[in-house]
A protein has these predicted regions:
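Sequence-pattern detector for short linear motifs
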Residues: 13-14, 22-23, 65
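Acidic/polar surface patches and capping/hinge elements
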Residues: 36-434
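N-terminal secretory signal peptides that target proteins for export/translocation
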Residues: 1-18
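Bacterial N-terminal signal peptides
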Residues: 20-32
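Short linear motifs centered on Gly/Pro in flexible linkers and helix caps
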Residues: 11-12, 34, 38
């Protein structure tokens, strides 16, 4: 489809991330639990049901990465097909894989979200009770599986002790000025931390070497007097305002703006939808889910480091500012964004970061971008045939929501794809006999 009028004449579209107009076709909301083929996908879906208690999206993905690593390592302590993330010893090969998966996931979720203990305990008890009895040749298989899961969960929980997650937020003291991020309404009342996740750049990564390794470079659009910045400013001002979007709530632009923050960027739900019908086994599912969540977590570390390095303002602040020094921009003190602006700086964008990292892992895993899936979120169902189309829509969504400039969203995808490739090629690699 054709690019938006605002985009014409600007830099070339991001490779394999086409702009489309209109569109073709905090993050993890509760989604219906469909019946899946195995315990790994079942526990992944259950984790989505309780993960909101972990905190904001960066905190959620950290917990999900730990959970999926524990599941992966538990299975590979029973049958070693892939390198484990943590050091776990081998267990009886007759141990129940499903018991191991259940205990590994439940232990990490309980430890990281104690407020959900009752719900997790009930789900775990039901999962164990539903297991078939052990064969005569493998007495004690369920207890052995439980022990394997407990060991892998303990290993990753110990490894992530003191990883920096206890101090996600830091004081923010920059004074208002042209281009400088400032909190946007509605701000939470004290003592809620605002803005948020300045400390997330200090989180110990799961796989990348450092938070700077794939950090988005300084973009030309950060120069307020440039034509490039003016183009970005005028695009989001035109298409992301509450007045424009609310006047056409059922338009493609308005629907995609709502879809992604309502759960359309739930990479675990996307991964489960992608693998449906592919006849993967528990080991393959576990490896993919662990890689996706590690990549997203590490990409967000990189993103928040960049956000608080550049501290670039959000469209709301920019459009309200009386004089940014650019003759091609015109302030509007009455302008409001279609959706509420998240409480942290603009560049680069977080939601497209998650999409880019997770999608790249799946592309690398399956060796193709053509991975069709359908996912419902926020009362909207969308279908994609290529992962890059979903990434592209996630970029558009933040512009149509009025909460991001396009260049920051594209940068988020670019840097996170690099993270996804790194994670895939360095972590949980197949063992030689596989």
């Amino acid at each position: 489809m054709n690019a938006s009028p605002q985009a014409k004449g600007r830099r070339a579209a991001l490779h394999d991330l086409p702009r489309r107009w209109p569109l073709a076709c905090a993050l993890l909301l509760s989604l219906p639990l469909p019946a899946f083929a195995d315990s790994v996908t079942d526990w992944s879906a259950f984790a989505d049901e309780v993960i909101g208690s972990a905190g904001g999206p960066p905190q959620q993905f950290r917990v999900l990465a730990m959970t999926q690593i524990a599941v992966h390592d538990a299975l590979n302590s029973i049958d070693r097909r892939y390198r484990t993330y943590s050091v776990v010893g081998p267990v009886n090969p007759n141990a129940s894989p499903d018991a191991a998966v259940a205990r590994a996931a439940a232990d990490v979720l309980r430890a990281t979200m104690p407020s959900q203990a009752a719900t997790i305990n009930a789900h775990y008890a039901a999962a164990i009770a539903a297991l078939p009895g052990c064969p005569v040749a493998a007495p004690g298989c369920i207890d052995q599986g439980i022990a394997a899961g407990a060991a892998s969960a303990a290993a990753i929980l110990q490894e992530r002790q003191g990883d920096g997650s206890a101090t996600p937020h830091l004081p923010y003291t920059l004074a208002p000025g042209p281009g400088i991020y400032q909190p946007t309404p509605p701000t939470p009342p004290p003592p809620a931390p605002y803005p948020q996740f300045a400390g997330w750049a200090n989180l110990v990564p799961f796989a990348i070497i450092s938070r700077r390794q794939f950090m988005a470079p300084r973009a030309p659009e950060l120069r307020l007097k440039s034509r490039a910045y003016a183009d970005e400013y005028n695009e989001v001002k035109a298409v992301g305002s509450f007045a424009v979007r609310n006047a056409a709530p059922d338009s493609e632009e308005s629907r995609v703006a709502r879809y992604f923050p309502a759960g359309g960027a739930n990479l675990n739900a996307i991964a489960r939808a992608v693998v449906a019908g592919k006849s993967l086994d528990r080991w393959q599912h576990a490896r993919l889910f662990a890689l996706v969540n590690m990549a997203v977590t590490d990409a967000l570390i990189t993103t928040f480091h960049a956000k608080y390095t550049y501290t670039f303002w959000r469209p709301y602040t920019a459009i309200h500012w009386s004089d940014d020094g650019n003759p091609r921009t015109r302030p509007d003190p009455a302008w409001t964004s279609y959706l509420t602006t998240p409480p942290y700086p603009d560049y680069p964008c977080g939601l497209p970061t998650t999409m880019g990292a997770g999608a790249q892992v799946m592309r690398s895993y399956f060796g193709t971008n053509h991975l069709p899936y359908t996912l419902a979120a926020g009362g909207i169902t969308r279908s994609y045939t290529r992962l890059s189309d979903a990434e592209s829509d996630s970029v558009d969504a933040r512009v149509y929501a009025g909460i991001h400039f396009r260049f920051g969203c594209e940068a988020g995808v670019v840097q996170s794809r690099k993270v996804g490739k790194w994670v895939y090629h360095t972590q949980l690699r197949p063992l030689p006999h596989w």
